[in-house]
Amino acid sequence: MPAQIIDGKTIAATVRQAVKQQVKERIDSGLRAPGLAVVLVGSDAASEVYVGNKRRACEDVGFRSFDYDLPITTTQKELEKLIEELNDDDAVDGILVQLPLPAGLDATPILERIRPDKDVDGFHPFNIGRLSQRIPALRPCTPKGIMTLLEHTHVDLHGLNAVVVGASNIVGRPMSLELLLAGATTTVCHRFTKDLSDHVKRADIVVVAVGKAEFIPGEWIKPGAIVIDVGMNRLPDGRLTGDVEFSVAAERAGWITPVPGGVGPMTVASLIENTLQACVDYHDVR
C-alpha cells in the first residue's frame, strides 16, 4: 500500500494562518505587530530566493519586515555592528542572518552576537542548550517544522526507533534532540557511520538531511516507517529531488514527505511562529 503523503504546504499554510489571526488580534487590541529583520550579505541566487520567501511570509501574516541587503564587501565588524543595532531596536523581535555568508565572514561570532531572545533561527548556543536540557525556548526552525509534520501523522513517537542521517548543526544535531524530547530512541548517522543501511532498515522514523540526491535507496526503508526527506537537490534535467529515492520508498513507507512541498514550507512557517513567540514571550511590555 503506498505511503500517505505528509503535505508540508497545507500544514504550513495552516500554521501561517493561525499566526496571522493572532497578529490581527494583537493589533486589534492595541499591541504592535511583531518585527523580523532579515539580513542578506552578497547576491547568492539561492539565498535571494530563500530570503524572498521569508520576507513574503512575514508580510503575509502582518509582521513588520526590516530588510537589510548588504554588499558582498561588508566586513565582519560592519555586520557585527548591525547585529548590535538590531539587538537594541525594540521594534525588532527576531533577527535572521541568511546563511551561508560570503567568504571572509565568520558566521559563528555573528550568530552568537544575536541576542538569544531574538534568535528566531534557533541557532544560538543558549537556545540549543535549552533544547538539550529539555526546556526549549526558541527552537531551530527546520527540526521544529519536522516535529509539526510528525504531529500531523498522529503517530505516538514514544519508544520508536528514530534514525537521523546527517549531523549538521542546522538540522541533524538539533533534530536528534527534538526526537529525544519526543520520547524516541534516537540514533544519529554521519559520514563515519558504518553499515548505514542496517541503521536505516530498523528505523521506524527516518530523517535524512545530507544534500545528496537519492542518497538513501528506497529499498532500505522499513515497511510502515515514517520518512522525512529534508534534502533539496536539482538534477541535470532541472527536476528537484530529495535525499531519499522517493518512488521506491513511497511504496514501503507508512508516511513520507515529498520534495518539494514537504519540509521546506515548514521551515519558513516555524520561523514565523518563532518570531511571534519572541514578541509575546520576551518583548511585550508586561
UniProtKB/Swiss-Prot annotation:
The record's annotation in Gene3D superfamilies points to: Leucine Dehydrogenase, chain A, domain 1 (3.40.50.10860), NAD(P)-binding Rossmann-like Domain (3.40.50.720)
Q: Does the keyword Hydrolase apply?
A: yes
* One of the record's GO cellular component terms: cytosol
Mention one GO molecular function: methenyltetrahydrofolate cyclohydrolase activity
**CDD domains, per this entry?**
NAD_bind_m-THF_DH_Cyclohyd (cd01080)
* UniProt similarity note: Belongs to the tetrahydrofolate dehydrogenase/cyclohydrolase family.
What's its job? Catalyzes the oxidation of 5,10-methylenetetrahydrofolate to 5,10-methenyltetrahydrofolate and then the hydrolysis of 5,10-methenyltetrahydrofolate to 10-formyltetrahydrofolate.
| Subunit structure as annotated in this protein's UniProt entry | Homodimer.
Protein name (Swiss-Prot/TrEMBL): Bifunctional protein FolD
- Gene this chain is encoded by: folD
